[in-house]
Amino acid sequence: MGISRDSWHKRYKTGATQPVPHKKRKFELGRPAANTKIGAHRVRLVRTRGGNEKYRALRLDSGNFSWASEQTTRKTRIVDTMYNATNNELVRTKTLVKGAIISVDAAPFRQWYEAHYALPLARKKNAKLSEEDNAILNKKRSHHTMKKYTERQKTAAVDALLIEQFNTGRLLARISSSPGQVGQANGYILEGKELDFYLRKIRAKKAK
């Protein structure tokens, strides 16, 4: 028996079985879930109705995540799955699905912020900087260039909860694409009330 997306195999509310109007049709077919896991990039092509194509991601290790308040997007490494509203089993098995809350590497976003604003982000006072970071933050700039950075720095404030996350080197993000259909795990960084909500959910789950 194949996976079918029809409704006539279900019983009536009274408990009676529905009559079978016809055999299964090609347009009613369903496919097994992709169950995308964290690992070295592995994507398969699936031919669909009308000769169209879907990209079935079996393993993914990175994705494009947008930082909405800063209007920037960076490709970053996926570290772990943290929370899933539908099923804890998907968290335990580290399955990447649309709507999953995951942790991603904060480094690309920190590098962008420090290059864009010429300000350190979530760094300890008097902490030793690498040569690369030192070249960005303490670079000699012309008066004209500094004027541009000074103007940018007026809007450089970052949410306190987000700074805490930058300190750990991990950011919470939500997957907004369907990895089993588009072959990518793209999403956005959690901020503000949404971040606060999911932090409370994760803490409550750990406390059990």
From Swiss-Prot:
Q: One short Pfam family name for this protein?
A: Ribosomal_S8e
Zinc as UniProt keyword: no
InterPro entries to which the protein is assigned, alphabetical: Ribosomal_eS8 (IPR001047), Ribosomal_eS8_CS (IPR018283), Ribosomal_Se8/biogenesis_NSA2 (IPR022309)
Q: What is its main location?
A: cytoplasm
Domain of life, per UniProt, equals: Eukaryota
Please indicate if the UniProt record lists GTP-binding as a keyword: no
- Annotated keywords: Cytoplasm, Lipoprotein, Membrane, Nucleus, Ribonucleoprotein, Ribosomal protein
Give Gene Ontology CC terms.
cytosolic small ribosomal subunit; membrane; nucleolus; small-subunit processome
Gene3D superfamilies for the chain:
3.10.290.70
Give GO BP annotations, semicolon-separated. maturation of SSU-rRNA from tricistronic rRNA transcript (SSU-rRNA, 5.8S rRNA, LSU-rRNA); ribosomal small subunit biogenesis; translation
Molecular functions (GO terms): structural constituent of ribosome
Q: What is the membrane topology noted in the UniProt record heading this document?
A: Lipid-anchor
Cross-referenced PROSITE patterns: RIBOSOMAL_S8E
Localisation: Cytoplasm; Membrane; Nucleus, Nucleolus
Family (UniProt): Belongs to the eukaryotic ribosomal protein eS8 family.
Q: What does this protein do?
A: Component of the small ribosomal subunit. The ribosome is a large ribonucleoprotein complex responsible for the synthesis of proteins in the cell. Part of the small subunit (SSU) processome, first precursor of the small eukaryotic ribosomal subunit. During the assembly of the SSU processome in the nucleolus, many ribosome biogenesis factors, an RNA chaperone and ribosomal proteins associate with the nascent pre-rRNA and work in concert to generate RNA folding, modifications, rearrangements and cleavage as well as targeted degradation of pre-ribosomal RNA by the RNA exosome.
Query: Assembly and interactions?
Result: Component of the small ribosomal subunit. Identified in a IGF2BP1-dependent mRNP granule complex containing untranslated mRNAs. Part of the small subunit (SSU) processome, composed of more than 70 proteins and the RNA chaperone small nucleolar RNA (snoRNA) U3.
> What protein name applies here?
Small ribosomal subunit protein eS8
Origin species, per record, is: Caenorhabditis elegans
